[in-house]
C-alpha cells in the first residue's frame, strides 16, 4: 500500500479519536444530569428522564460508538501497513490504555441502561469522578504517541499524579459550592 493510504488511515484515525472522546466526555456529563434529575418533582423527573434517555442513546449510538469503530479500524489498518510497530514498547503500552478506554466505553453503556431502567445506584458525585477517567487516558495516550520510546517517565508520572489531584480537588470544590448554592436558594 502507498504512503498516501497510510496518511488517509492516520487522518481518519485521528478524526475517530476526536469524535470518540468528545462523545465519551459528553455522554457521562449527560449521565450526571440524568442522575440529578431524579431529585425533581415527579412530572419534571419523568420528562427529563425521557429526554436524557433519548439524548444518551443518540449520542452513544450515532456519535460515540461510530467514533470508536472508526478510530480502532483505522488503527488496525495502520498496524497492518506497519506490523513491525507491534514490537515497539510504546505502542504495546498505548494499546493497553486503549483497551482500558474500550472497557470504559462498555461501562458507559451499562450506566446508560441502568439510568434508563431506573436501576442506577451511582451518585452524581461518582459520575463526576468517572467522567475524569477519559481525560487521564487521553493525556497518557497522547504523550505515548508523541514521545514514543522516549516517554518522559518522571515528568509524565508527576504530571498524571498532579492532574489526578487537581481533578479530584476540583470535583470536591464544585460539589461544595453547588451544595452551598442549593442550600442558600432553598433558604430564600
List each model region and its residues.
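Polytopic transmembrane helical bundles with strong interfacial aromatic enrichment
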Residues: 1-188
Amino acid at each position: 500500500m502507498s504512503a498516501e493510504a497510510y496518511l488517509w488511515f492516520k487522518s481518519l484515525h485521528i478524526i475517530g479519536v476526536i469524535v470518540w472522546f468528545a462523545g465519551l466526555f459528553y455522554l457521562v456529563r449527560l449521565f450526571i444530569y440524568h442522575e440529578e434529575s431524579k431529585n425533581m418533582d415527579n412530572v419534571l423527573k419523568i420528562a427529563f428522564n425521557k429526554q436524557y434517555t433519548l439524548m444518551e442513546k443518540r449520542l452513544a449510538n450515532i456519535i460515540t460508538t461510530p467514533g470508536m469503530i472508526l478510530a480502532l479500524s483505522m488503527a488496525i489498518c495502520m498496524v497492518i501497513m506497519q506490523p513491525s510497530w507491534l514490537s515497539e514498547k510504546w505502542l504495546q503500552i498505548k494499546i493497553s490504555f486503549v483497551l482500558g478506554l474500550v472497557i470504559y466505553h462498555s461501562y458507559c453503556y451499562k450506566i446508560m441502561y441502568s439510568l434508563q431502567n431506573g436501576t442506577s445506584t451511582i451518585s452524581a458525585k461518582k459520575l463526576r469522578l468517572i467522567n475524569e477517567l477519559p481525560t487521564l487516558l487521553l493525556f497518557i495516550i497522547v504523550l505515548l504517541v508523541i514521545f514514543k520510546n522516549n516517554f518522559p517517565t518522571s515528568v509524565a508520572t508527576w504530571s498524571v499524579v498532579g492532574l489526578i489531584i487537581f481533578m479530584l480537588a476540583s470535583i470536591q470544590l464544585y460539589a461544595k459550592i453547588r451544595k452551598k448554592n442549593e442550600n442558600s436558594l432553598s433558604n430564600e
